[in-house]
Amino acid sequence: MSYKKRGTRNMSETFLPANILMPQVDSMKKWAVIACDQFSSQPEYWDEVKEYVGNTPSTLHLMLPETYLGSEEEDEKIRKIQSTMKNYADDHLLKTYENSLVYVERTLQNGKIRRGIVGAIDLEQYSYTPEHEAKIRSTEKTVMERIPPRMKIRYQAPIELPHVILLCDDWKNEVLEIVTEQKADLEKLYEFDLMQEGGHIAGWLVDGEVKEQFLEKLQSYEEQMTEKYKDLSDDPMVYAVGDGNHSLATAKACYEKLKKNHQWEHIKDHPARYALVELENLHDDSQQFEPIHRVITGTDPEELIHALKTECCSEEGQTIRCYYGKKEEVLHLNLHKHQLAVDKIQTFLDKYLKDNSGCIDYIHGEDVLKELSKEEQTIGIELPAMEKDQLFPSVMTDGTLPRKTFSMGHACEKRYYIEGRKIQR
C-alpha cells in the first residue's frame, strides 16, 4: 500500500498518515516503556521496569534495552522479541487504524505540555549522511558501528515501535495548532500516567477532515521552508531528527538492504520504505535546549587556554567562560556565519587532545562544571545554549552537529513506546 494515494489535495509526501497499530490492553501504564537508548548505564532502571511489568503485555517485551547490547543473551532476546511481536499480532492485541495520524500531548514533570503528531516518513526523503541534502536529516553524526546490532532486531521484525522525535522549524506555530484547536472533536485513544516518573500522556485519533487540514498545512510549511532557506541551499532541510537518530538510521539501512535484494517495482510500496515518528515543533515552549559543557581533566589548563586563544579567539565574537582552579577567563570565539560555539570548541578539543594529555567529559549544569574545575589539572569550558533558530541553518551549513551539542530534556522525558506499525508484508 502506498500512503501517497489520498486524492487531489495538495499535501506533503514526506510526512504521511500510516496504518497505526494501537494496543488493546488492560494496563496502558505497563504497555508504555521508555526508549531503548535511555538509562543504558543504569541496568537497575530496567530491572525495576521488568519487575513492574512482569508477564503482562508490554513494549518491554518488544524491544531490547541498549544496556543489554553485546550481552551473551542478545541473539536469544532478539528471537524472543520477534516471536512476541508475532504473538501480539496473532492474539489481536494490536488494532489497526488505517491511513491515520495520532495527536499526542505529553505533560512533563515541569508541568509543560509537549505536543506532537505520530505519522510515517518516507525514508527516500531521509539521509543520515551529511553530504546528502535530503528533506529529513540527522542532527548528530551517526556512529556506523551502532547500526548493525539494531539491524539484527529490525530487519526481520514484523512491527516497529517509534521513539524518534522529528522536529519542524515552524516559527509561525501553525502546523500543530490546527489539530490542537479541534482536539475536542477527535476520538481519544488513550490517557494515562507513564511509569517511572515519565509524566502524563494522552493521544487522539486524527482522521477525516482534520487530518486533511493538517496535511495541507504541513505542505504549506514545507514550501515556506524552501523560501526561508533558499540562500543556504537549493534543497533545504525541512525536518530535523531531534531524538532517535540511530534508530531512524537503522530503519534507513534496513530499507536500503531491501532495495539491494529486490527490484524497485516489488518494493516501492513496501511498508519498510516508511518509518513511524512523532513530529514536534522546535519552537514550542515545551522544547528546552540545555547546553552541555566540557570539562578536561589530566591536562595543563594554562597551555590549553593559550592554544585555545591562539587558534579560536579574537577580540570580539561569541562569549564563553573557562574555569580552572580559582580563575575564570572570558574568551571570544571567532565563528563563521551560522557556526555554533560548541562546533568550534569540540573541533579544537578533538585536535588538541590528540597531541596533548587530557580526557574530556560532558557536563550538565554550570554549578557542577565550576565545582569540577577546581580540581588540579582540570579546566571547565562553559558553553552557551544553542538558540532554536540556529539548529536548521547550522546543520545545513556544517552538516551534522558535534556530539553532545545540546540536550532536549531529561532522560525520563524521552519518548515512550505506545503506537506501532507493520513493516513486513
Predicted regions located by residue number:
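Short beta-strand segments
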Residues: 167, 242, 278, 382-384
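Catalytic or ion-translocation cores adjacent to nucleophile or general acid/base/metal-coordination motifs
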Residues: 245-307
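Structural beta-strand/beta-sheet cores of well-ordered domains, especially the beta-sheet scaffolds
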Residues: 58-60, 162-164, 237, 272-278, ...
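C-terminal catalytic or substrate-handling cores of phosphate/nucleotide-
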Residues: 293-405
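N-terminal extension/subdomain marker
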Residues: 3-198, 207, 224-228, 386-401, ...
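Active-site beta-strand/loop microenvironment that shapes enzyme catalytic pockets
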Residues: 216-262
